[in-house]
Amino acid sequence: MDKNAIDKSEYPRTAELENRCVNIIANLWHAQPAENYMGTSTVGSSEACMLGGLAMKFAWRERAKKLGLDIHAHKPNLVISSGYQVCWEKFATYFDIELRTVAMDEQHQSLNMEKVMDYVDEYTIGTVGIMGITYTGRYDNIAKLNDLVEAYNKTTPYKVYIHVDAASAGFYAPFMEPDIKWDFQLKNVVSINSSGHKYGLVYPGIGWVLWRDKQFLPDKLIFKVSYLGGELPTMAINFSRSTSQIIGQYYNFVRFGFNGYKEIQKRTHDVAVYLSSEIAKLGHFEIVNDGSELPIVCYKHKINDGVDWTLYDLADRLRMKG
């Protein structure tokens, strides 16, 4: 557990475990070996999202230069719903990207497919679909987004692609909702991230990011280090970190297997649906997400409920109970 994951030449078995995890996840997300998929572990989904975003930025820049676009005329942009996790705001700030957010509202509690392509232009490095909106637990319709992107790409040489932020659903949907197409089954989904320490069932913190093909991970983002006993490639932002999370992820994959993960996620789903039904019976709350998709229960206070307390008061009282 005290071994450094970056020192792969000193601890080759750790590198082997990481590669096995990448292969297992690639299979789970329907990556095709013929497309030369690639992936890496990260400290969490925040790092994984940034790697996915950086790959999109560098790939866009290479495509734009070949097409003769003045890449300095406007700031590159990334299109995402306003329900994004804060790591995307950090990515945009750190790497000088305009974050174009498609507003959510009562009728659109995930990415608004009627408006999303209005935000796309030749300076768009990519679009992000979210499998598990932070505020509602809803899924973006990735299959619909794929169709919209496919239609757009047929009209312009300035192609755009999709990164799926599946921090929550990446290790849930494949087991509980296998009929939903959101992953590498879709042509324009080029990268996916997920958190191993959420529904991957590992202690914090570990994330994963995969690309469907090496062409979507520019060579400039793969660094070769030779001062740890051998020349080895690395693509993660962080460097030194413990191997314990990688070992924990591999152990879970082997220990639970597909059926074990499915059983655990089903129990979580059942608890979420039960909780939402009981909360609804209290009469004070409107259920926004009942846990029937991602097992996240989301509710809000009913308007004109006639009580003199707020959800913040409720949260404070719940903290008193631990």
Kindly label every feature range from the protein language model:
Residues D2-A48, A59-R63, L67:
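Conserved N-terminal alpha-helix of the aminotransferase class I/II PLP-enzyme fold
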Residues E18-A26, Y84-E89, N112-V120, N238-Q245, ...:
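Structured alpha-helical segments in the cores of large, soluble enzyme domains
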Residues M320-G322:
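Conserved PLP cofactor-binding pocket of PLP-dependent enzymes
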Residues D305-L314:
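Short, conserved charged micro-motifs
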Residues D2-S9, P33-T40, H72-K75, L99-M104, ...:
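Glycine- and acidic
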Residues I133, F175-E293, K300-D305:
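Active-site C-terminal subdomain of aminotransferase-like
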Residues T40, G44-K220:
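Conserved PLP-enzyme active-site core in the AAT-like
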Residues E35-N36, A73, N289-I296:
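Short Gly/Ser/Thr- and Asp/Glu-enriched loop/turn motifs at secondary-structure junctions
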